[in-house]
C-alpha cells in the first residue's frame, strides 16, 4: 500500500482557521489555472506565490541525490526529468512557506524521487519536496493537483469552488468507514495474526477509530466485509462519492485504478464514472490500498485496462463526483496491528505503518487544514516508529518505504 495525499488545500470544519504562505508550483502550460487557484486560496486566508518549473530550470542548479536507494537517473525512466526534480528541491531550500501546492501531473512537475527499497519495486514520492534538506522531517505541507491540461485544471477549480460553497451544509460531519479483510503485514515485527493467512485488518482499523472516539464525533456509516454483502460496500462507496459526506476511510487492498470491495471484487474508476454529484459536499478520501495514490502514468507504464477511465487518485479529483482530496500510498504498502488480551477479550493495542499515518491524519483533521493534519501525522509517525534515512534491517527499510509512499492529493488545503 502506498500513501499519496492529494491536497486541494482542504479546510475542514473551519474555513481559514490559520493563514500561511503558500507556493503554487506549476508550469507555464497551466499558468492561467494557477492564477485562479491563487485567487481561491487567498479568499480562504492563504497568501500565495506562483513559481513555474521553467523559472526554476533557468535559475537553480540541481542539488545532491537523496540518500535513499532509488532509480535516480533518466536512463531508467526516459520521461522522468530527474534534473528538474533536483532543481525544484534546490529552490525549495530557499523557501519560507507553510504550504506547497503542486499544480500539474508527473509529466509537468516530476516526482521528487523514485525510491527503490524493500521489494525492489520503484515508486514515486513527492516527499523530498516536503523535506528538501533530506532529514525526513516535513518542512512544508505538500499536496498535488494532478492536472495535465488547462481543461482538467478548470474542472478541478470548479470542484474547489463548489466545495467551499458546500461546506456550510454541515455534511462534513458524515463519515463512511469501510473495513475489508486483507493479508497480514509482510514485515510485522510480532507477526500477530488471527489465523495463518490473513487478519481482519480493515475491521480492526474501524474498531480502533471507534476506540479513539471518531464515531462519537461523526455520523458514521460502517460497511464491513464480514457482513458478506459486497453490495453494501459498493453501495457505501456509491453513496459517499455522490456527495453529502465529509470523510471516507477505507482499509483494504488497492491497485492503481481500484480499491478493494469484496473477495475478488474491486471498486474501480469505471464505477465512479457512473456517478453524479447528488448532494452538497464531496469527501476527503483516505485509503491504505496499495498503489491507489499512483500518479505517474505519464512516466511509468502503469497497467490500466481499456475500460478504466484513469488512475484512482486522479479520477477521484477530476470526475464530477468522487472526492475533494485523497490521502493514500503510491505503491506496495502495509500496516501492522498489535493486540492485547484482557479478561478473555482481545483488544486493539496499536497500529504501525500505513494505517497509522491515515488514522493520525484523521485525529488531527477536525479544525485544521488537511495539509497541516497530514504533515503532523508524518511527524508523529517518524518519531513514534523511529523512521531512519539509512535503514540497516528489512524492518527499518519497510518503515521508510511506507513513510515515503504516503502522498496527499487535494483540491483545497
UniProtKB/Swiss-Prot annotation:
Coiled coil: none annotated. Keywords: Signal. Residues 1-20 form the signal peptide. GO terms for molecular function: cysteine-type peptidase activity. Gene3D superfamilies: 3.40.50.1460, Gingipain r, domain 1. One of its GO terms (biological process) is proteolysis. This is Uncharacterized protein AF_0048. InterPro entries: Caspase-like_dom_sf, Gingipain, Gingipain_N_sf. The lineage of its organism: Archaea, Methanobacteriati, Methanobacteriota, Archaeoglobi, Archaeoglobales. SUPFAM superfamilies: Caspase-like. Pfam families: Peptidase_C25 (PF01364).
Amino acid at each position: 500500500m502506498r500513501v499519496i495525499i492529494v491536497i486541494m488545500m482542504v479546510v475542514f470544519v473551519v474555513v481559514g482557521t490559520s493563514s500561511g504562505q503558500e507556493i503554487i508550483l506549476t508550469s507555464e502550460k497551466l499558468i492561467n489555472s494557477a492564477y485562479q487557484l491563487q485567487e481561491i486560496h487567498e479568499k480562504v486566508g492563504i497568501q500565495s506565490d506562483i513559481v513555474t518549473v521553467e523559472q526554476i530550470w533557468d535559475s537553480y542548479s540541481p542539488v545532491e541525490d537523496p540518500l535513499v536507494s532509488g532509480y535516480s537517473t533518466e536512463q531508467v525512466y526516459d520521461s522522468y526529468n530527474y534534473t528538474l526534480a533536483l532543481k525544484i528541491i534546490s529552490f525549495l531550500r530557499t523557501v519560507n512557506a507553510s504550504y506547497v501546492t503542486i499544480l500539474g501531473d508527473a509529466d509537468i512537475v516530476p516526482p521528487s524521487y523514485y525510491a527503490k527499497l524493500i521489494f525492489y519495486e520503484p515508486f514515486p514520492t513527492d516527499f523530498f519536496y516536503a523535506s528538501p534538506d533530506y532529514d525526513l522531517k516535513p518542512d512544508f505541507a505538500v499536496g498535488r493537483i494532478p492536472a495535465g491540461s488547462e481543461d482538467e485544471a478548470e474542472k478541478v477549480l470548479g470542484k474547489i469552488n463548489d466545495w467551499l460553497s458546500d461546506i456550510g451544509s454541515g455534511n462534513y460531519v458524515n463519515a463512511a468507514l469501510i473495513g475489508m479483510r486483507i493479508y497480514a503485514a509482510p514485515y510485522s515485527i510480532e507477526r500477530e495474526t488471527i489465523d495463518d493467512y490473513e487478519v481482519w485488518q480493515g475491521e480492526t482499523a474501524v474498531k480502533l477509530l471507534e476506540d479513539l472516539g471518531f464515531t462519537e464525533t461523526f455520523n458514521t456509516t460502517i460497511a464491513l466485509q464480514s457482513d458478506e454483502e459486497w453490495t453494501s460496500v459498493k453501495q457505501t462507496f456509491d453513496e459517499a462519492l455522490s456527495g453529502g459526506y465529509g470523510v471516507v476511510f477505507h482499509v483494504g487492498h488497492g491497485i492503481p485504478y481500484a480499491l478493494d470491495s469484496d473477495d475478488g471484487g474491486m471498486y474501480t474508476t469505471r464505477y465512479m464514472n457512473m456517478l453524479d454529484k447528488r448532494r452538497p459536499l464531496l469527501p476527503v478520501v483516505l485509503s491504505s490500498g496499495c498503489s491507489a495514490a499512483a500518479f505517474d502514468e505519464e512516466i511509468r507504464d502503469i497497467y490500466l485496462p481499456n475500460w478504466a477511465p484513469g488512475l484512482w487518485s486522479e479520477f477521484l479529483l477530476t470526475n464530477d463526483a468522487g472526492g475533494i482530496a485523497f490521502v493514500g500510498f503510491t505503491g506496495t504498502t502495509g500496516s501492522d496491528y498489535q493486540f492485547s488480551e484482557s479478561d478473555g477479550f482481545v483488544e486493539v493495542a496499536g497500529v504501525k505503518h500505513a494505517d497509522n499515518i491515515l488514522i493520525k491524519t484523521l485525529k488531527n483533521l477536525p479544525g485544521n487544514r488537511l495539509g497541516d493534519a497530514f504533515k503532523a501525522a508524518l511527524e508523529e509517525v517518524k518519531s513514534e516508529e523511529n523512521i531512519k534515512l539509512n535503514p540497516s534491517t528489512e524492518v527499518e527499510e519497510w518503515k521508510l518505504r511506507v513513510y515515503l509512499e504516503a502522498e496527499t492529493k487535494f483540491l483545497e488545503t
